[in-house]
Amino acid sequence: MKIRLFAPPIVAAFFVLNCWAQNAPASTPPPNSFLDRLTSLTDSDSRPWTAEQFATMGRIRDAAMTDPNAYNMLAHLTDNIGPRLSGSLQAQAAVEWVAAKMREMGTSVTLEKTTVPHWVRGKEDAVLTRWPGMPPGTTQKIVVTALGNSAPTSEDGLTANVMVVGSFAELRSLPVGEVKGKIVLFNKPFDKELTAQGFGLDAYGQNLAYRGVGPSFGGSLGAAAVLVRSLGGGDFRLPHTGLTLYGEGVDKVPAAAITAEDADLLARLSKQGPVTMRLTLTPKTLPPTSSYNVIADWKGSEHPEEVVLVSGHLDSWDLGTGAIDDGAGVAISMQTIHLLQSLNIHPKRTIRFVAWMNEEFGVSGATTYLQEHSSELTYHIAALESDLGCDHPTGLSFFGAPEAARYLAPVANALAPIGASVLTRSDEVTAEDIAGMVQLGVPGLSPSQDSRFYFSYHHSAADTLDKVNVRQLNENAAVMAVTAYALADGSEAIPRRK
């Protein structure tokens, strides 16, 4: 359930008050009237922040919009270090670089050890060797990429007929044995209309199960391999990778994503007659290895034991360079600390930066954090994560108590000059690394980003630095930094779910 609250609330309040004043009788309104409740929104005595703190929010916001540091850090992370698949040399280099940068900012840095899988992509090739109307002696290439955690084919590949289905239900309804030995394609189109309306994450969620468990489901019915239509809205004949999981006791069959264009091609050809494919995937699953969450504390001036956490995940997929997923989230979270340092601002509570390791391949970094800090969660005032790219932020999404809306209204008002004043409450936590904390009662927040374009590039070779708009990146940094400061310096903590 998502509830959108229109903002800036104080501007709305003044508008309603003005209309009321023009038409109201001269008599004094009764206590606790609608006017009283609206007036309370503008009563500074009822807020956790003073006028000076509001001014500081403005300073942070304005500095974020002109400071090039967020983009410069993101450029180094993506261009110089590159893709950061869990277990890779690049992932380790990223850990060391981020830790060094945070030490330069004057934070107390901890490397928190966690165990990560080590899966390595190999050869990827798919060709049609038979289809209706094929010219003799020809083949037809299909653009394919292995899903993370996929089992391999043999080095020579496997050749089998392709079976196209639109849903789990359709595959389940087929006669027993009909799936055996086939290459199954789950062809569920990505909802571009929903995405164009700004609900890309919802469109993604509708199809996620096909990538996540489709190969396991197909394997349980005897499929030789499973293909999924890429989860993305781009029409560039680029496949989108992502993690797949196998159930216990089920044969681990090779699993790959193909482009939307190729999925449509196979669907059309299959209606005309048999289609045969030779599929070659040679990934390797190596023994698990060690990596690290990077934790950096900007110590609180009065209550250092109380923590406001800002975060993004440091690992990425290996097809692109992980600029929007989630180098941007890491960079804008680092920028929160940089801005506080450069402006010499020391909030009452500690602001903790975390670069999560292994979000893409099983969230082991976040799991380790929960285990290591379980006794401290009472003192975690809030947890923020950015993991939906860095297009224009419309405001804040918060996961938790409905009462937090009134608490956050002044913060949204401080973000109104950059068009980021809408508050949205959601019962569903969409930020994976902080989800465990939120379930245990820690208030969670994320920038609400325009997701119309994000899934065109997500998990694909097109996730590169050129997709980042510098101004919009800075807007996201402003949202993260202003919110973190407000939560860390307020006289009251944000309400927790009861």
Give the ranges of each region predicted by the language model.
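Second-shell loop/turn segments in exported
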Residues: 57-65, 79-89, 160-165, 174, ...
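N-terminal capping segment at the start of a domain
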Residues: 48-88, 238-243, 315, 387-391, ...
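Short helix-loop-beta-strand segments that form the rim/entrance of peptidase-like active sites
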Residues: 72, 338-364
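His/Asp/Glu-rich mid-to-C-terminal helical/loop segments that flank catalytic regions of hydrolases
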Residues: 338, 342, 455-498
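Soluble metallo-hydrolase cores and metallopeptidase-like ectodomains found primarily
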Residues: 56, 130-131, 143-176, 244-323, ...
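Metal-dependent peptidase/peptidase-like ectodomains
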Residues: 155, 160, 253-258, 263-264, ...
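Noncatalytic luminal/extracellular "stalk/propeptide" segments of secretory-pathway proteins
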Residues: 29-49, 53-55, 75, 79-196
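Bacterial N-terminal signal peptides
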Residues: 7-18
